[in-house]
Curated annotation (Swiss-Prot):
Pathway: Lipid metabolism; fatty acid beta-oxidation
Record carries keyword Transferase: yes
The protein, known as: 3-ketoacyl-CoA thiolase
Keyword Isomerase: no
Pfam family for this entry, one: Thiolase_C
Enzyme Commission designation: 2.3.1.16
Species of origin: Pseudomonas paraeruginosa (strain DSM 24068 / PA7)
Length: 391
């Protein structure tokens, strides 16, 4: 395909292994260190990219305090080969932060405000808890239900509205672990995981090149034994069908098509369209439906044109209604989250948007796909979507 000079292309993608937040591999590694390691290694494996050309490092992170505070993008950038003359900013759209980082870079490239960007995100949920320092305004309850800020209850609501059974959720949860384990065993994550030193359960330092979050022994039967996590009386959402609390980072090198051509770089993909949308916070998990429909319309496509989809698995009770209304339920085994998702790999908030987008590009490459969609719900009622075309 022919590209326009200001088209936005993805040059490379990498991520850390996903670590458990409670006593996991990253327990002695800071968020900025994790981010800097990832950026450095990704630049090292792309020698045609001069770090001095980086216009901006745009890093997603949700809880921007403690080690994640004071513009972690700049903190991490200063610890890499990127010179001090390049800029850096940290962005937050809660769960969609690093996809927003990608969109911010893309919009800059499209408008001629830079040619080379490093984007991604991090969340060390073991060091900085998701509610650390958060103080919601009590008056918000005048405008949205108080439970809208409780993500598990919004998933319960969405599941109930769409008739999603406990068994369907357990099947979806087991599928995530089984597919992630299969992808691991077959080396499907090899191109995206950048090995990192960490500590095993016995405290020994070792190099990790795999996700420690996957539980290959997970079955529908074992998940059926779990109690509801958010609504003890009559609830259906359990810890086993919710995204794991994990630590991780993801990173992409993004360029204008013209600069990639000048440097003799073959891109992974080009961005065809982007979109964000809002929904009632009480059903926050439904956000990917309007954002995906908007992005597809902007690209002149329909969901039937899409070869592969990565939908962030915040909750099975949330993902299944989204897939139903995007008319993907009957295509799930062919198109959706073929390497598992956040139920198995976890959802480090600031990391996930770039993570699912990069995984999508690898799935497209491994399976000969042309068009792909990455999409996710966002806390308090948003959706964000990117449409890619492989080149």
């Amino acid at each position: 395909m022919s590209l326009n000079p200001r088209d936005v292309v993805i040059v490379d993608f990498g991520r850390t292994p996903m670590g458990r937040s409670k006593g996991g591999m990253h327990r002695n590694t800071r968020a900025e260190t994790m981010s800097a390691h990832l950026i450095s290694k990704l630049l090292e494996r792309n020698p045609k990219v001069d770090p001095a050309e980086v216009e901006d490092v745009i890093w997603g992170c949700v809880n921007q305090t403690l080690e994640q505070g004071w513009n972690i993008a700049r903190m991490a950038s200063l610890m890499t080969q990127i010179p001090h003359t390049s800029a850096a900013q940290t962005v937050s759209r809660l769960c969609g932060s690093s996809m927003s980082a990608l969109h911010t870079a893309a919009q800059a490239i499209q408008t001629g405000n830079g040619d080379v960007f490093v984007i991604g995100g991090v969340e060390h949920m073991g060091h900085v808890g998701m509610m650390h320092g958060v103080d919601p305004n009590p008056h918000l309850s005048l405008y949205a239900a108080k439970a809208s800020g409780m993500m598990g209850l919004t998933a319960e609501m969405l599941g109930k509205m769409h008739g999603i059974s406990r068994e369907a959720q357990d099947k979806f949860g087991a599928r995530s672990h089984q597919l992630a384990w299969k992808a691991t065993q077959e080396g499907k994550f090899k191109d995206e995981i950048i090995p990192m030193e960490g500590y095993d359960e016995n405290g020994f330092l070792k190099v990790f090149d795999f996700d420690e979050t996957i539980r290959p022994e997970t079955t529908v039967e074992t998940l059926a034994q779990l109690k509801p996590a958010f609504n003890p009386k009559g609830g259906t959402v359990t810890a086993g069908t919710s995204s794991q609390i994990t630590d991780g980072a993801s990173c992409m090198i993004v360029m204008s098509a013209q600069r990639a051509q000048d440097l003799g770089i073959q891109p992974m993909a080009v961005i065809r369209s982007m979109a964000v949308a809002g929904v009632d916070p009480a059903i926050m998990g439904y956000g990917p439906v309007p954002s995906t429909n908007k992005a597809l319309k902007r690209a002149g496509l329909t969901i039937a044109d899409i070869d592969f989809v990565e939908l962030n698995e915040a909750f099975a009770a949330q993902a299944l209604p989204v897939l139903k209304d995007l008319k993907l339920l009957d295509k799930m085994d062919e198109k959706v989250n073929l390497h598992g998702g956040a139920i198995a790999l976890g959802h480090p908030f600031g990391c996930s948007g770039a993570r699912i987008s990069g995984t999508l590009l690898n799935v497209m490459k491994q399976n000969g796909g042309t068009l792909g969609v990455s999409t996710m719900c966002v806390g308090l009622g948003q959706g964000i979507t990117t449409v890619f075309e492989r080149v």
